[in-house]
Amino acid sequence: MALDTSTKAQIVSDFQRAQGDTGSPEVQVALLTARINGLTGHFKANAKDHHSRRGLLKMVSQRRKLLDYLKGRNVDSYRALIERLGLRK
């Protein structure tokens, strides 16, 4: 599901490194996580929506790639991000 403008702006302001930062891996992962969480609710009501499921899998893959990139560049930032988003147990 697409995020509305106010939700997206809130996520960007929470995870940006500096003012106006929208492209850092932290922001991109947070936005993808919000979209993924929105789609998981959609699949509870629409279990046979395979077209959207493919999009979900692409988003999960993109998030995984960004997290791998961030882990290679800055492990402390990676750990802080997954803690804030609640991605790992």
UniProtKB/Swiss-Prot annotation:
Q: Which PROSITE patterns match?
A: RIBOSOMAL_S15
Entry-linked SMART domains: Ribosomal_S15
Q: What GO annotations for molecular function exist for this entry?
A: rRNA binding; structural constituent of ribosome
Q: Which UniProt keywords apply?
A: Ribonucleoprotein, Ribosomal protein, RNA-binding, rRNA-binding
Its BP terms in the Gene Ontology are: translation
Family stated for the protein in its record:
Belongs to the universal ribosomal protein uS15 family.
Quaternary structure per UniProt? Part of the 30S ribosomal subunit. Forms a bridge to the 50S subunit in the 70S ribosome, contacting the 23S rRNA.
Q: Which NCBIfam families match?
A: S15_bact (TIGR00952)
What is known about what this protein does?
A: One of the primary rRNA binding proteins, it binds directly to 16S rRNA where it helps nucleate assembly of the platform of the 30S subunit by binding and bridging several RNA helices of the 16S rRNA. Forms an intersubunit bridge (bridge B4) with the 23S rRNA of the 50S subunit in the ribosome.
Name it: Small ribosomal subunit protein uS15
Species, as recorded: Azoarcus sp. (strain BH72)
